[in-house]
Regions:
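Sec-dependent N-terminal signal peptides
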Residues: 4-13
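Extended, compositionally biased repeat/scaffold regions that form elongated interaction surfaces
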Residues: 23-188
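Bacterial signal peptide processing site
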Residues: 17-21
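Amphipathic alpha-helical interaction segments
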Residues: 13-15, 186
C-alpha cells in the first residue's frame, strides 16, 4: 500500500518542482523518495485548501516550456471529477484520488497512454500492491519524465493512477499556475 502513495507523491513532486531538478535529480527522487500514506494525503489537502483560498495569483513565469498542463484530479464517487490544473512545461500527468463511502471497494488502477498501448483494469488491493511493487508504472513515468532528448517519441507513455481511499474531499474546480502549484505542494 505504501508504494501506491509513494507513486502518488512522486508524480506531484515531479510536477510541482520540475524546474528545480535536472535529470539526475529527478531520477534520484523517483528511485529513493519514501513517504507515508498520511503525508501523501496531506499534500492533496494542502492543494485543495490553497485552491479554496482567495489569495491565488495568476502570473506564470516559466523558464522552460509552457502551454502544457499538469492535472491533479481528485475523484469522488457519484460526482464529477475535482480538478487542480497547472500550466507548466513538458509532460501531462494525472493523479487521481477516488473517494468512496466504503473503503472496502477494490483499489482501481488505470494506466492511460496517448493513442496507443492503452491498458486499464480493476484490481484487488493486493493485486495493486503487487503491480506497483513490480515497478511497471514507475518505469513508465521515469521514461517519460527523464528522457527529454527523445521526448516526442515518449509521449505515449503517460500513466495515471486512481487510488481509492475513504477520505473526505470538498468539491472544487480551479486553475493553478506553475508557481502556485510549486508553492502549494512544496515539501517542508
Amino acid at each position: 500500500m505504501k508504494s501506491i502513495y509513494t507513486f502518488l507523491l512522486l508524480i506531484i513532486v515531479v510536477s510541482a518542482c520540475q524546474s528545480d531538478f535536472d535529470n539526475a535529480d529527478l531520477d534520484s527522487l523517483l528511485r529513493n523518495q519514501d513517504v507515508s500514506k498520511k503525508r501523501a494525503l496531506k499534500i492533496i489537502e494542502k492543494a485543495i485548501a490553497a485552491v479554496e483560498s482567495s489569495e491565488l495569483k495568476t502570473s506564470l513565469k516559466n523558464e522552460l516550456r509552457s502551454n502544457v498542463k499538469y492535472n491533479y484530479t481528485i475523484y469522488r464517487s457519484s460526482s464529477e471529477p475535482v480538478k487542480i490544473t497547472a500550466d507548466i512545461h513538458d509532460e501531462t500527468y494525472t493523479v487521481r484520488a477516488t473517494y468512496y463511502i466504503h473503503d472496502s471497494i477494490p483499489y482501481f488502477m488505470q494506466g492511460t497512454m496517448r493513442d496507443q498501448d492503452r491498458a486499464s483494469g480493476r484490481y484487488t488491493h493486493q493485486e495493486l500492491i503487487t503491480y506497483f511493487n513490480g515497478k511497471k508504472v514507475i518505469k513508465q513515468l521515469k521514461k517519460t519524465a527523464l528522457n527529454k532528448e527523445n521526448r516526442a517519441s515518449d509521449l505515449s507513455h503517460i500513466p495515471s493512477v486512481d487510488i481509492t481511499e475513504d477520505i473526505k474531499q470538498p468539491d472544487l474546480d480551479a486553475l493553478l499556475r506553475y508557481e502556485e502549484v510549486k508553492s502549494i505542494l512544496k515539501i517542508q
